[in-house]
Amino acid sequence: MSLGTSEQSEIREIVAGSAPARFARGWHCLGLAKDFKDGKPHSVHAFGTKLVVWADSNDEIRILDAYCRHMGGDLSQGTVKGDEIACPFHDWRWGGNGRCKNIPYARRVPPIAKTRAWHTLDQDGLLFVWHDPQGNPPPADVTIPRIAGATSDEWTDWVWYTTEVDTNCREIIDNIVDMAHFFYVHYSFPVYFKNVFEGHVASQFMRGQAREDTRPHANGQPKMIGSRSDASYFGPSFMIDDLVYEYEGYDVESVLINCHYPVSQDKFVLMYGMIVKKSDRLEGEKALQTAQQFGNFIAKGFEQDIEIWRNKTRIDNPLLCEEDGPVYQLRRWYEQFYVDVEDVAPEMTDRFEFEMDTTRPVAAWMKEVEANIARKAALDTETRSAPEQSTTAG
């Protein structure tokens, strides 16, 4: 049986579109800075090309295009010699400013021997690289804020995770407005949710309560009450989340980093890391163990996200209900990083606020949690009584 014309016209079709051909303008984190300070060159596939990353004699990290402008050798397979990176093909020595400094077998270096040097930022133990399709340097007002705990002995060192994801990086950006997925995908329970977009910053403020159906309190363990999360993207790919876990009688303060850089239009490297504030309850090794436990918990959450992304389709025209977040407004904000600077429109950067009315979601989710707990209790009762019935029958 075929549908009539009127019924056919009512069907909502998905507009998948295609990912932007260019990569986002902004600061992108490449990982822990210390990993690049071992005296060796490192290759990084990013922005549709290959980069070489190394630290000079002053421990200052340098980044160039990886392919030598002489004959195309891969500089990331070369050697660090003094402050320069030496090509493995003919030993041309390239400085951090992109200029060829020395050719051992040549009388002179050609004046035009220059490759692309990338702006870097080594801050709070993290390495950032600036990407701009127009080739402009980073503006003074587009910055990554300092993370006080990252350089303090009162906090742990970074616990860091890295994985590749085979999809366009817009998928992870959408999560900042998607309150409902925290309940259904991550088994969290948001009770307050607000977004603020302004300039190059997009923020999410969330409060959550513990879920006894999915993460029941274990006897002898601290009881979690809930969590407070104040998370902001500074630019297209780097999020700082001031995350507080609330337990009976005390809180645990942490900072979660959620960041990525594009490899190609359909692949990105996802990284996330955590530090935890030490306290009388969390000293020394115990604080680091807590950071690792929290980090492993966050890792499971990202694995849940990745499984969704792996199987979903790109959708440029999502069909939303009132209790969905401001997806279209977020995507307008995100678009500013994919157009030339002179084409950034006010609607991409003007302040926008949206606080979710959580009345309906919280009521529905509470019923679901209660039903899950009741179902589990009935199953436990049935399981415990089964052996007794078997013995009586015998």
Swiss-Prot record:
What turns on this gene? By cholic acid.
Q: Which reaction does it catalyse?
A: androsta-1,4-diene-3,17-dione + 2 reduced [2Fe-2S]-[ferredoxin] + O2 + 2 H(+) = 9alpha-hydroxyandrosta-1,4-diene-3,17-dione + 2 oxidized [2Fe-2S]-[ferredoxin] + H2O
Name-wise, this protein is: 3-ketosteroid-9-alpha-monooxygenase, oxygenase component
User: What highest taxon heads this organism's lineage?
Assistant: Bacteria
Describe the task this protein carries out: May be involved in the degradation of cholic acid, a steroid acid found predominantly in the bile.
Q: Where is the Rieske domain?
A: 27-129
Keyword Oxidoreductase carried by entry: yes
Q: How is the cofactor bound?
A: Binds 1 [2Fe-2S] cluster per subunit.
The positions annotated for binding [2Fe-2S] cluster are 68, 70, 87, 90
User: Native species of this protein?
Assistant: Rhodococcus rhodochrous
Q: CDD domains of this UniProt entry? A: Rieske_RO_Alpha_KSH (cd03531)
UniProt entry keywords in alphabetical sequence: 2Fe-2S, Iron, Iron-sulfur, Lipid degradation, Lipid metabolism, Metal-binding, Oxidoreductase, Steroid metabolism
What does the record give under GO molecular function? Answer: 2 iron, 2 sulfur cluster binding; 3-ketosteroid 9-alpha-monooxygenase activity; iron ion binding
Q: Which GO terms describe its biological process?
A: cholesterol metabolic process; lipid catabolic process
Q: Which residues are noted in the entry as Fe cation-binding?
A: 175, 181, 186, 305
Enzyme Commission (EC) number: 1.14.15.30
Q: State how it assembles.
A: Homotrimer. The two-component system 3-ketosteroid-9-alpha-monooxygenase is composed of an oxygenase component KshA and a reductase component KshB.
What PROSITE patterns is this protein classified in? RIESKE
Q: Which residues bind substrate?
A: 245
Entry cofactors? [2Fe-2S] cluster; Fe cation
Pfam families associated with the record: KshA_C, Rieske
